[in-house]
Amino acid sequence: MIVGIGVDLVSVRRMQQLLERFGNRFTTRAFSEVEIRDSLQYKNAHAVARHFAKRFAAKEAYVKAVGLGFGRGIEMRGVSVFNDALGKPRIAVSGDVGHNVELSLSDDGEYAIAFVVLHV
């Protein structure tokens, strides 16, 4: 049974501006160690911005699906987005509430989008 749906759209350009302006101060507050480590595989700033934009969109879509929002029991770093061995995007949540999570990520170069479905 579906218990929540969330979607979010993030500007890759805006993410790149945040990364340029705040650097590690931003990434260490918003992203997990896994997400930061995974970003190291990219060689140019635009690819890094796309990586983080997709993950940021996934976090926002997840909290929308849960219906709580950040700061209401869910911390941004507590939601970690990664790819499994087959490349499928996954979400791990600190203090997981027991939902199964389906995640789809995409980008077109200018925008990143995430769609989350929670089910039991």
UniProtKB/Swiss-Prot annotation:
It comes from the Bacteria. GO terms for cellular component: cytoplasm. This is Holo-[acyl-carrier-protein] synthase. GO terms for molecular function: holo-[acyl-carrier-protein] synthase activity; magnesium ion binding. Signal peptide: none annotated. Its cofactor is Mg(2+). It is found in: Cytoplasm. Transfers the 4'-phosphopantetheine moiety from coenzyme A to a Ser of acyl-carrier-protein. It comes from Anaplasma marginale (strain Florida). Mg(2+) binds at D8, E60.
